[in-house]
A protein has these predicted regions:
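Short flexible/disordered coil segments
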Residues: 59, 99-118, 200-220
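Gly/Pro-enriched, hydrophobic low-complexity segments
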Residues: 146-232
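Intrinsically disordered, low-complexity segments enriched in polar/charged residues with Gly/Pro
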Residues: 50-52, 60-61, 71-73, 78-81, ...
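Bacterial Sec-dependent N-terminal signal peptides
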Residues: 1-23
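Catalytic loop of the DD-peptidase/beta-lactamase superfamily, centered on the K-T-G motif
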Residues: 83-94, 104-111, 223-232
């Protein structure tokens, strides 16, 4: 009996290890599709994102991300209202509603919004490579799901509490491993949060980045808007 239990424990360990390997294989293949030369870690580029929303004027954002230089800049223009946030190493500059410019550090609560923007855009436009970041917990099980009639390999990701609390799912084309959909939930309740449908591709510094992102509510498929990437 002891031998059987020991062998069962060994078999269980092998199965779990195999599942984990499969999940990371899918992620590695997805990264191989989007960033075949490993350029993300040294990414330095500028691009424009036009956000189209129902019944609202478009918001045009010009974004600069320089990972080696630890630099981020976001300038937005919506209906003639212009704002900017800039972070360089530990220094932070941003414009207030009245147009005045504040210079401070990233530890200042006033810069919280600027840090949020930096993390937001670096995360979204750095996927799926960002799923290798510390604090990211990749579920070892690869799910097979249908989404809007198409088959996908789905990876579930959670984060250490210090990183984030949302639960994410990433949908990859089973043939090419291109990332085509992702969604997040605010809790185990899958009616919370949003899903994002990706379409088109743009090559930026050797990285294949989804061109358009259409955002919807999970609860009722309500349409929120579409981010459209523009490369000058």
């Amino acid at each position: 009996m002891k031998i059987i239990i020991t062998n069962f424990a060994l078999l269980f360990s092998i199965v779990i290890s195999g599942q984990e390997l499969i999940a990371y294989q899918v992620l590695d293949k997805a990264i191989g599709y989007h960033d075949p030369k490993g350029n993300w870690s040294r990414f330095a580029g500028e691009f424009q994102v036009v956000l189209e929303m129902p019944d609202k004027p478009n918001r045009v954002s010009r974004i600069t991300i320089d990972l080696p230089g630890d630099y981020f800049n976001l300038s937005t223009d919506q209906d003639g209202k212009i704002n900017f946030s800039e972070i360089k190493n530990n220094q932070c500059r941003f414009s207030k509603e009245d147009g005045t410019v504040v210079t401070t550090t990233v530890n200042d609560l006033q810069c919280e919004r600027g840090v949020l923007f930096k993390n937001y855009y670096t995360y979204l436009y750095g996927l799926p490579m960002k799923l290798k970041d510390p604090g990211t917990n990749l579920d070892p099980l690869v799910q097979h799901k249908k989404f809007k009639g198409n088959d996908f390999l789905v990876l579930k990701v959670t984060y250490d509490e210090t990183v984030g609390t949302d639960i994410w799912q990433f949908y990859f084309n089973p043939d090419t491993y291109a990332m085509e959909v992702y969604q997040f939930f605010k809790s185990s309740d899958e009616s919370t949060g949003e899903y994002i449908v990706l379409s088109g591709e743009v090559l930026v510094n050797g990285i294949t980045i989804p061109k358009d992102r259409a955002w919807y509510f999970n609860k009722d498929n309500g349409y929120l808007g579409t981010d459209k990437l523009v490369i000058n």
